[in-house]
Swiss-Prot record:
Post-translational modification: Processed in virion by the viral protease. Highly phosphorylated on serine and threonine residues.
Role noted for this protein: Counteracts the innate antiviral activity of APOBEC3G. Forms a complex with host APOBEC3G thus preventing the entry of this lethally hypermutating enzyme into progeny virions. Functions as an adapter molecule, recruiting APOBEC3G to the ubiquitin-proteasome machinery. Targets APOBEC3G for degradation through the assembly with elongin BC complex, CUL5 and RBX1. Binds viral RNA and affects the stability of viral nucleoprotein core. May play a role in viral morphology.
Protein keywords: AIDS, Host cell membrane, Host cytoplasm, Host membrane, Host-virus interaction, Membrane, Phosphoprotein, Ubl conjugation, Ubl conjugation pathway, Virion
Note: Required for replication in 'nonpermissive' cells, including primary T-cells, macrophages and certain T-cell lines, but is dispensable for replication in 'permissive' cell lines, such as 293T cells. In nonpermissive cells, Vif-defective viruses can produce virions, but they fail to complete reverse transcription and cannot successfully infect new cells.
KW Lipid biosynthesis (keyword) present: no
Protein name: Virion infectivity factor
Induction: Expressed late during infection in a Rev-dependent manner.
Gene source species: Human immunodeficiency virus type 2 subtype A (isolate CAM2)
UniProt motif HCCH motif: location: 110-141
Amino acid sequence: MEEGKSWIAVPTWRVPGRMEKWHSLVKYLKYKTGDLEQVCYVPHHKVGWAWWTCSRVIFPLRGDSRLEIQAYWNLTPEKGWLSSYAVRMTWYTEKFWTDVTPDCADTLIHSTYFSCFTAGEVRRAIRGEKLLSCCKYPRAHRSQVPSLQFLALVVVQQNDRPQRDRTTRKQWRRDYRRGLRLARQDSRSYKQRGSESPAPGAYFPGVAKVLEILA
């Protein structure tokens, strides 16, 4: 009597393009800007007991939790070279783990990385003063119900930007495939605004947008 096969199914998100853009952005924000300095990046490697290969990006979060994004190549039931890509997103602690969606991954990353509006910005906006902080990860708020204060600060932030910055933001929306250049351009533009500009740091376009899933 033949022994039946046992399968372990996990949810993955199919990526239509290649993974170089995701890896380039993570490495740029880790080694160049320092926004993801605490992130552990495991480059593309072969899994010894399988025919597929993968890479790992591990985000340490608050407490003892972690968010891990694994990128798979050739993740198919058949052996052989098939140009297919997929990602798996897992949140885990020492005793528990679960798979999460890209929107949830954005929220988890923003809870630890990339600055957001501070409490004093509402008072500055009411007094008509220039904002000293801004949200570097606006996509992380898409899955949440935004407060009136947050919506008002977003409008003030958009109106306070120079025209060249608005043009750059429109370009980012039209072509989200330029994730690495997005971070570089935003970092340079804020360095040119003087001492009254918001805190330095790069924008993060969001996991789904960089990987072109659900975007």
